[in-house]
């Protein structure tokens, strides 16, 4: 979980995972970002290599349009989260926005093997899938899980034993993942 008052000094890096990564296997370099009021969880497949990052947070590649799309949807300005001068994204705007909206981020893979030197899902081999049920237990207010690609969707469906992958834009129900307390 994150504390909104300390976000500017918070590191989102998962230093233990970074330290145990090898040339062969990469462990997830970021901690799950799960605001206390998380209602929507975005799940990608895995971050790009750190050499492609412009910030230590989700969707860190400056050529990726995720933060531009969020800016356009929520603020009518594709550059709302963009620092053009420094070619990075504005974490000082992103974090409070996500906390206010209750939007969380993580990925469907906890460890991967890159089959080529790039960020393409096509060349990611799952070594350790994320325990999505355990992740959702941490955010009981979550009502929507959004996957951001085919590989993330496949892994999520495998986790919940859903045999038919949804088409793009289609919503499906996943089993109740919250423990009865």
Residue ranges and their predicted role:
Residues 1-13:
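Intrinsically disordered, charged low-complexity linkers and terminal tails
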Residues 11-144, 150-167, 181:
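A polyanion-binding, active-site-adjacent surface
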Residues 166-178:
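Domain-level recognition of soluble alpha/beta enzyme cores
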């Amino acid at each position: 979980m994150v504390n909104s008052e300390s976000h500017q000094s918070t590191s989102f890096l998962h230093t233990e995972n970074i330290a145990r990564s090898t040339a062969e296997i990469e462990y997830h370099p970021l901690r799950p970002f799960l605001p206390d009021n998380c209602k929507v969880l975005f799940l990608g497949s895995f971050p790009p290599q750190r050499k492609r990052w412009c910030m230590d947070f989700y969707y860190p590649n400056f050529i990726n349009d995720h933060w531009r799309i969020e800016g356009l949807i929520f603020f009518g300005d594709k550059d709302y989260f963009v620092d053009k001068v420094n070619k990075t994204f504005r974490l000082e705007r992103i974090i409070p926005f996500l906390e206010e909206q209750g939007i969380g981020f993580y990925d469907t893979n906890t460890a991967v093997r890159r089959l080529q030197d790039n960020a393409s899902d096509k060349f990611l081999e799952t070594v350790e899938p994320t325990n999505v049920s355990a992740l959702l237990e941490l955010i009981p207010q979550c009502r929507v899980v959004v996957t951001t690609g085919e590989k993330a969707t496949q892994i999520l469906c495998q986790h919940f034993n859903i045999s038919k992958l949804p088409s793009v834009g289609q919503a499906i129900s996943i089993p109740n993942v919250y423990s009865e307390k």
